[in-house]
Amino acid sequence: MGQELSQHERYVEQLKQALKTRGVKVKYADLLKFFDFVKDTCPWFPQEGTIDIKRWRRVGDCFQDYYNTFGPEKVPVTAFSYWNLIKELIDKKEVNPQVMAAVAQTEEILKTSSHTELTTKPSQNPDLDLISLDSDDEGAKGSSLKDKNLSCTKKPKRFPVLLTAQTSADPEDPNPSEVDWDGLEDEAAKYHNPDWPPFLTRPPPYNKATPSAPTVMAVVNPKEELKEKIAQLEEQIKLEELHQALISKLQKLKTGNETVTSPETAGGFSRTPHWPGQHIPKGKCCASREKEEQTPKDIFPVTETVDGQGQAWRHHNGFDFTVIKELKTAASQYGATAPYTLAIVESVADNWLTPTDWNTLVRAVLSGGDHLLWKSEFFENCRETAKRNQQAGNGWDFDMLTGSGNYSSTDAQMQYDPGLFAQIQAAATKAWRKLPVKGDPGASLTGVKQGPDEPFADFVHRLITTAGRIFGSAEAGVDYVKQLAYENANPACQAAIRPYRKKTDLTGYIRLCSDIGPSYQQGLAMAAAFSGQTVKDFLNNKNKEKGGCCFKCGRKGHFAKNCHEHIHNNSETKAPGLCPRCKRGKHWANECKSKTDSQGNPLPPHQGNRTEGPAPGPETSLWGGQLCSSQQKQPISKLTRATPGSAGLDLSSTSHTVLTPEMGPQALSTGIYGPLPPNTFGLILGRSSITIKGLQVYPGVIDNDYTGEIKIMAKAVNNIVTVPQGNRIAQLILLPLIETDNKVQQPYRGQGSFGSSDIYWVQPITCQKPSLTLWLDDKMFTGLIDTGADVTIIKLEDWPPNWPITDTLTNLRGIGQSNNPKQSSKYLTWRDKENNSGLIKPFVIPNLPVNLWGRDLLSQMKIMMCSPSDIVTAQMLAQGYSPGKGLGKNENGILHPIPNQGQFDKKGFGNFLTAAIDMLAPQQCAEPITWKSDEPVWVDQWPLTSEKLAAAQQLVQEQLEAGHITESNSPWNTPIFVIKKKSGKWRLLQDLRAVNATMVLMGALQPGLPSPVAIPQGYLKIIIDLKDCFFSIPLHPSDQKRFAFSLPSTNFKEPMQRFQWKVLPQRMANSPTLCQKYVATAIHKVRHAWKQMYIIHYMDDILIAGKDGQQVLQCFDQLKQELTIAGLHIAPEKIQLQDPYTYLGFELNGPKITNQKAVIRKDKLQTLNDFQKLLGDINWLRPYLKLTTADLKPLFDTLKGDSNPNSHRSLSKEALALLDKVETAIAEQFVTHINYSLPLMFLIFNTALTPTGLFWQNNPIMWVHLPASPKKVLLPYYDAIADLIILGRDHSKKYFGIEPSVIIQPYSKSQIDWLMQNTEMWPIACASYVGILDNHYPPNKLIQFCKLHAFIFPQIISKTPLNNALLVFTDGSSTGMAAYTLADTTIKFQTNLNSAQLVELQALIAVLSAFPNQPLNIYTDSAYLAHSIPLLETVAQIKHISETAKLFLQCQQLIYNRSIPFYIGHVRAHSGLPGPIAHGNQKADLATKTVASNINTNLESAQNAHTLHHLNAQTLKLMFNIPREQARQIVRQCPICATYLPVPHLGVNPRGLLPNMIWQMDVTHYSEFGNLKYIHVSIDTFSGFLLATLQTGETTKHVITHLLHCFSIIGLPKQIKTDNGPGYTSKNFQEFCSTLQIKHVTGIPYNPQGQGIVERAHLSLKTTIEKIKKGEWYPTKGTPRNILNHALFILNFLNLDDQNHSAADRFWHSNPRKQFAMVKWKDPLDNTWPWPDPVIIWGRGSVCVYSQTHDAARWLPERLVKQIPNNNQSRE
């Protein structure tokens, strides 16, 4: 801390002086406050140690983020002002011109005077070089360093740092010739930092022309000290010139092999260059060059020497085997990534090693597996470096870095530039660090835990090493490492860190735990930590006290041996008396060597240290002592008093104990056992000195009859407290026991549980019931407070009917029992009058007199039972009870519902109703499934091969051991099978299709995937994955039997083993929904408690996001608890705590959301099914990719053609190129999180074919696309934009919950007004939108592609007829004949089409082709074409529909090529109206008619009529005048009619004598019509005329609707006969018939023969429908009403009777006099013969006669009827 503060002050001092030189005066205190704010917002800044422009701009970015996050009130007013002042100071482009001139002059002097090595050395004070002035000017950079292309004869130029202090040669400094002043290795490594982001633009690491390095200067006043520095430089220049002259003279005098070298080569001829600053010409490898003596450690593969002429030569030498051996030994003994091994590797890497040398070295040192791992990592690092080199443009590619391709030879690799060697070094060492730790199989980071005696620093080192392997660098996971450094530390270190956990960083942790060693030091370390000191300082401070306390008298200033009082008191030596131990001699007890007492009883061993050996000592425990096993029981008589006048006996702990506040009250052993002396009881009180030290001793009462061990109840109040062994901490006060006559409740106490006498809680009981009124989900309930009830119970009568409840698997017991009671399906929010609230899930029981509030609710309300008695209250306080904190030892209370614990020993005593309800713990399970039928389903098990059967047996055994299945005797059975996965493992599957068919399917709870873009920007996230989610959710017990299966045996050697699933089975239709509901219920409490969190749950993936990281972790902790309670488990390896996250197929990295890398397997795309799957996946990713519909059109076109899924498909060149584009888009495109504080913009771009939408907030958020296939064949582009607006608004509300603030589309305001007036979609799209509709796009490069498509409005096709235009009429026929007429000319031609619409479209194309340059007024009788052709001008994409799309495309091209407008209008055909337009249309229509070459015969006409209408044989015979047998053969040969045989008529019904006299009415069902399956049928019994309508039901209102329709066709009947259905017998229907004066009669109940006529009509109608439904006539296909009307047309107008009359003829042209025979009949009542009357029906043995006298029909036996001739005789 002191170092950081001194550096802090030094910054401020220098900045104040620097600002003062610019005329800016600031206060020292203000700058200190400013840097305090810098430290808070940028914790990394003080550790950097330097201010330069790049770091300072990072500080500015942090300021801006802090401002955006917390607002202006959290930022000091002067923060940005001071930041700008300092930026101007350190930005060289903005420095005072005078200062710049002085610096430039200094650099010029340095350039001309740095030919020699300066003997002075820069100051080693790191605090001086705090502020650097970087130059962004390339020229300045180039001039600040020596030229790379200097002549080789010149010496290297050195630029020492400009210092403020006087520099002088230090006698202890190393020889300047041994110091490499270039010192660019570190800078080069930083320039090629492999941890840089891969796509950031940065300056090239090495410029071949002018290398540059930053000029580092201290902030000084150049004007004041420049002269002094220049004078020093001039002196050094003179010395250098003399030095160079001396060297030249000595070189001329050299003889033999003696050589005098420059200081650069003073250490030897061969050196390994360390980043030379000058360009060194490379020579060829000189193998024959004479080698001088070299030390082994300096022998490395590539070395460079400089000869006397200054020429540089490179050599390639072999490795010194001592280096390889040392590295091999270190890797074998300590591991490849041990610190010692890495140090050797780094020392080797400091030299020039070619890629081949690295590969040779690694292969020699490491094992085969590690070598391959290193090689793969090395190649990956080189690949990333090559990508950065490509951006930098320095030409160093992947082959050069790996030594492959053209650079595989050693000669080629020797010629590499120094910078390239540095990159190879960085890639190789980084790959080495990725090697696995020795003995570590690859454990996860959370598995690294500190051992009991492991030093904390070693533990942190292991954490950082593991994090480096996982994250690539330890810095990337520093927050995670810090968290685990506390969580996985041992208890001693955790206790030391805990008070400072949020106040320091990882280095602070290490400092706090530096003195914590083995267990015996832990107590001392904890005490020191909580006093804010190290152990050393803690001990030193204790030793600073002058003099100690005397152990004899307790006074300071002398020791016990010099105590005068002790000497005075013991002047007379006291002789020992009778030994209290053995009672057999006069000697001191501690000198007693007897093993038995005077009675012969064995004596316990001595306590304390003895000469025979070390004392046994108590067992030591950190968290509380236990009585040593060797320590014997001590009676009360062994206790001592502190002084003769002490009232109490001293109690002490038998072991060293450390107590923390988190532990709560602990029982400390004393080794003292009861009973107490007769007629006494004990009172335990704490010593006052102990209380001052923070140890609270709870008072306690010791009963006289208690014989167990007396313990001290103690608790650490605020800090960690160490209780040494033997220290007095409490006193036992013996008090007299007064016996009373009170009744004894229990027998002798003996060795019962430790504590005082049982306490009875006293509460006054009154006649008033303790009732309480609460609100559950805002509904008021009143109930009794029942402290004995485990759960809350609501009576069924008070429970709202619409609140869902479910059956449970528990029993409620009390005074009586309730089995499987119902419980609320969801948690309810309770609220009291004071607005306190919580969550409960009450039970619901019928016939309960009153609601009961149980402890699950009372504990949340923190209700306490208090007594007015001070004695009882004091007793409870003595037992450790603190009001408001609960009775737990941690005093933390119970804030959540009490877990229900079963009590099986309680029995009922009668009728159910209890005041204390005990509940068996419910087993949580999935909701019960609703079944269509309870009929068992049994599907036989398939036979399995021996291999598959063995695999199935093994898998079943594993599931049985896991508890997922159980043995079964269920009557249900479905087959199982096994499949082998690619990994070679088997997978067990069950065919549940038969079971799925019997269940009611649950709807999808999440119809779509959640989008990560809706997570608020800047939120911290935690993502978890539930482990085996389906197998963690129990099935409802009532459903388990339905998922049974059998395990067969070969050759039926044994009975099949039967099992059934206990958990959600896979492939069960409702498993996903049940899983989602179960998990959603489990995390409901978390959602309610953390409403500020953004929680996403999809299947087994859960994401938590929030602003505050600490709150996110707390929410995560509660989530883990709730999931654990629900039986769900989190996969530890799938907990994601930091970027990059992987979620639902996306990668979340900071604000960016990208798709995971994907490679499309083009060789697998062969069938329509393959392409359909591929396009489905691409379409799912399109909201996150910049791919338009036009881009994907080549792939969409592959889906056209044969509909067979296995039909062959192939990739076109365009589609192949598109797949590459898709891969690139997936790899490069990204979207961002939404910022809800900014306006949300929805941009619409004019892309080809269809428009494209984009949600935008300074960056893309989500792309929106219309379907690839338009909803209409011809969809205008402006209508497509309207559809996109609707889709965008829908997406905005669905994903973000808001409407877009601004919608930007391509049309101007005047164009939008036109669209609002002339289109249907635009008013709908903009309805109720209150945002801004604009056409000005934001300025951004990404938005430029919106200009790709030019939009158009109708210009060529006029909406009104043109003047002076050519009048043309077109027509087409289904025979393929097309024609158009103009004036007196008619042109017709034959086409190969058979659709009248398409033939007429051909005629229209011919007109546009024939008159391209003339205005036209075209009229057609096709309303379809008259509407479609005007749309072609604005349609961008035409839906593919066989020939239609081709003809429309051809017509559209003709329209685009026209420059003269035309008009197209519609005229009704065959209207018969006068005038030229009707005449012209008729003329064109006649031109399409063709004269048949031969006249069809009657037989052919009958066959065609039957094919179209399926007429019966009678009708065909009469209608086409063909023989009866030919008509029957036509019907028999029809494949449809052959299955419908005629049904004989077995009876007769009364019929009306006139039309509309008697109707019969009924309802029949035809399920294929869906919602319109109810067919209401009425038939006129006189004529057989049939009427029918389709209704959605059969109630009275539907019957009345049907009759009104019938009345509108044939009028009102006199009588209607129906059955006894509720729709006919209702009061409303009776009133309806009475109002219209219609007589309504019903038949015999449940006797359908009374409705025989209408029942036969049902059969005829359904038969006709079945026939025509299978035909090919266009109007009847797919439309129920058309099919029904066609059937009625056939039955009423086409079917003829033997009189050649249809039902319509009989109804409209009735002649009853010619139809009925006249008879006379005998009335059996009066024996009269009234005659003549007509016969309605002549049946078998009976006749129905219509009595004209009585105006009613009479049924008579045939013997009472006599037929008379039918003439005009009158009645007698």
Swiss-Prot record:
Biased composition (Basic and acidic residues): 138-149
An annotated GO BP: symbiont entry into host cell
Gene assigned in the entry: pol
Function: Nucleocapsid protein p14: Nucleocapsid protein.
Residue ranges of coiled coil: 217-258
Lineage: superkingdom: Viruses
Short sequence motif PPXY motif: positions: 203-206
Cofactor: Mg(2+)
Cofactor note: The RT polymerase active site binds 2 magnesium ions.
Native source organism of the sequence: Simian retrovirus SRV-1
Keywords of this entry: Aspartyl protease, Coiled coil, DNA integration, DNA recombination, DNA-binding, DNA-directed DNA polymerase, Endonuclease, Hydrolase, Lipoprotein, Magnesium, Metal-binding, Multifunctional enzyme, Myristate, Nuclease, Nucleotidyltransferase, Protease, Repeat, RNA-binding, RNA-directed DNA polymerase, Transferase, Viral genome integration, Viral matrix protein, Viral nucleoprotein, Virion, Virus entry into host cell, Zinc, Zinc-finger
Zinc finger boundaries on the chain: CCHC-type: 548-565
Protein name stated in the entry: Gag-Pro-Pol polyprotein
